Amino acid sequence: MRGVTALLPRRAAVRAPYWDTIRYLSGTLVLFGHLVDTLHDREGLVWLYLATWPLRVPVFALVAGWFSSAAPLTRDAARQVALTLLLPYLIVGFLHSAQQWWLTGRWWFYVDSPAWGAWFLLALPVWRLALPWLARLRRPVVWAVAAALVAGYVPWIGGWLALSRTLCFLPFFLLGWKLRQGAYAAALRPGVVWSGRAAVAVLAGAGVLAWCVRRQVDYDWLGMAQAYDSAGGPAIRAAVLLAGVVGALALLRLMPRRRIPVVSWLGAGGMYVYVLHPLVLRPLLHEGGVAWARSWPEQASVVVLACVLSAGLASAPVRRVTWWIVRPARAGAAAR
């Protein structure tokens, strides 16, 4: 039961500031990515979008895996999965439908085709249900990578039930679970000099590489939501998965274990940032979004805007008002 409820950030007697900080950083970067992912001609924003991709959904999936158990689901545990993940998925889908109707006059209820960003709520229960069986494999992460690569050859695996993304981000979920079992523990331990230097080099290298390829990268490669459209598709996806793993591990190694004022506290609302931000961004983007950001100072102000929006969504007042969307099964206690 513990592994199920921990799939989402939860209120506990003693919170882990390390994971809360990671949640908040990752959620903020997801919000930033969705705010700017249509601005392909703003070099600064494109660079930051590419450089931080490994720290967004790959990290969210990894954290979910860390807090998951490979124990078989009981009936009560399966019910809890449905209430904590599938019910929010339906609620969020309805809210997205209503918002789209309000903005465009068109109605579309998101069920088999997840609403913007909501695919993660569908993937989590699938990963959790599959974990007891996947854990029996000798090298589950390797098998998951193979499944992610094969998925690109199946045309009908795409947006339907987010199957492509569910398969393609499964390696990160399983990696998180393996880390909880002790994998790479020595390298990720604070104070290990060589791994700390390697992590700094990885993130610095990601920044340099992102700048060098900022005009060549197709954002669809990072989303991994569709079938391959070229012969080089499998190699590109393998490179994306590798970059995600290396970048996520680098973040885990460098993140301070101690509580960071304000940031760690906001991290308790990390899932609120992830679930709610599309509902906040859609009206903004409908009116032009941040297309005004052209100069470098203006592009920097977009980053500040993303941080402000993320802080607001993760704040206690917002959690008290919106608990019924993100965590309906736990009522208002989760937002206190």
Give a label for each model feature.
Residues 2-336:
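Alpha-helical transmembrane segments and their immediate juxtamembrane cytosolic regions
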